[in-house]
Every structure is written in structure tokens, then in C-alpha cells.
């Protein structure tokens, strides 16, 4: 079910903006809505957790550690972020973090770096979907 609400835009013209539901958010980011709903039972709780994900610094820490060549810090950040993504059923993003985390676990920063662009794209898609959902 799609919902719409009206807002006044520039010069007071009435325009419609789509309200994104939590389920639509998960669809947009290729996450597993049914799984997260079975875990937390309540869309309001899920939405609060989505809001907290926006402020999570794990991806930035991963990027910084990778840039500095710090394998241990990169592994810690990737492992933390992957755990959060698993808990929130961010299936697509989690899938891009798996090879990075495992490469870093083995100390192979070059292999992890090869997958960072894909992870960054999925991270951006996930954040974009969450931000659209949080506008409600």
C-alpha cells in the first residue's frame, strides 16, 4: 500500500511527496523485512533502530582504517558493521561486507580493498533508503 502526503513547495505550490514505509525501505535496500519484523515484532522499534544506523560510525572507521592500512582496525570496523547489518537484516549490504570481513580476518587488505567500492555503493543505497523512510 502506498501512502502520500501533501506539502507546500517553493512559492506555496501544493505538491505530493511519497511516504516510504519501513517495508518499502527494506525493499529498496534489498533487505529482509520479514526477518527483521520477526526479530523485533514492532515497526516503531525497527524505525528507531534504522535511525540509529544513520549515526553509526563503523563504515567511516572501516574506510579510514583501510586508507591507513591498519588491518586490525579495519577488521574490527568491518566485523562490527557486518554484525549490525545482520541484526537489522540488511541482506544486500551484509553480503558485500562478508568478503571484506573475511579477507581482513586473514590479513589480506588488498583483497578487502578490491570490494570496498561495491560495499560503499550498497552502504549509500541503504542510507538513502533509511533517510527516505525517516522523513515521515
Residue positions per predicted region:
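Two-component system phosphorelay core
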Residues: 2-76, 80-136
Amino acid at each position: 500500500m502506498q501512502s502520500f502526503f501533501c506539502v507546500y513547495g517553493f512559492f506555496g505550490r501544493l505538491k505530493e511527496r511519497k511516504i516510504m514505509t519501513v517495508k518499502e525501505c527494506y525493499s529498496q535496500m534489498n533487505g529482509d523485512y520479514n526477518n527483521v519484523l520477526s526479530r523485533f515484532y514492532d515497526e516503531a522499534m525497527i524505525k528507531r533502530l534504522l535511525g540509529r544506523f544513520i549515526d553509526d560510525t563503523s563504515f567511516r572507521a572501516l574506510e579510514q582504517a583501510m586508507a591507513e592500512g591498519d588491518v586490525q582496525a579495519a577488521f574490527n570496523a568491518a566485523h562490527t558493521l557486518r554484525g549490525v547489518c545482520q541484526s537489522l537484516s540488511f541482506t544486500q549490504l551484509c553480503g558485500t561486507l562478508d568478503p571484506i570481513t573475511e579477507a581482513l580476518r586473514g590479513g589480506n587488505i588488498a583483497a578487502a580493498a578490491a570490494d570496498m567500492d561495491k560495499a560503499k555503493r550498497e552502504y549509500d543505497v541503504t542510507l538513502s533508503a533509511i533517510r527516505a523512510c525517516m522523513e515521515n
